[in-house]
Swiss-Prot record:
InterPro entries: NADH_UbQ_OxRdtase_chain4L/K, NUOK/Mnh_C1-like
Gene source species: Pseudosoriculus fumidus (Taiwanese brown-toothed shrew)
Transmembrane segments: 1-21, 29-49, 61-81
Protein name per UniProt: NADH-ubiquinone oxidoreductase chain 4L
Reactions catalysed: a ubiquinone + NADH + 5 H(+)(in) = a ubiquinol + NAD(+) + 4 H(+)(out)
Length: 98
């Protein structure tokens, strides 16, 4: 395993641990999720380039599309919660149910 793979794995682990530790605020959770998606994108791009697997060359693009959708939904939830309650706590998401 090369040093690049270990650094990317470590970055994913740090982002995941950040998601577990700072899960009370929605903004912190969204930043950790974006870090995880960025490391997954880099890892999939490196894997496609190293294996010369042309059929899977769309995988990083599809991953970026899902990351953009996740960011848009997360930011809209953040705006809705902060406008409604004035804070960005994740526990306020349970109060948004009809």
């Amino acid at each position: 395993m090369s040093l690049v793979h270990m650094n990317i794995g470590l970055a994913f682990t740090v982002a995941f641990l950040g998601l577990l530790m700072y899960r009370s605020h929605l903004m912190s959770s969204l930043l950790c999720l974006e870090g995880m998606m960025l490391t997954l994108f880099i890892m999939s791009s490196i894997m496609v380039l190293n294996m010369h697997f042309t059929l899977a060359s769309m995988l990083p693009i599809i991953l970026l599309v899902f990351a953009a959708c996740e960011a848009a939904v997360g930011l809209s939830l953040l705006v809705m919660v902060s406008n409604t309650y004035g804070v960005d706590y994740v526990q306020n998401l349970n109060l948004l149910q009809c």
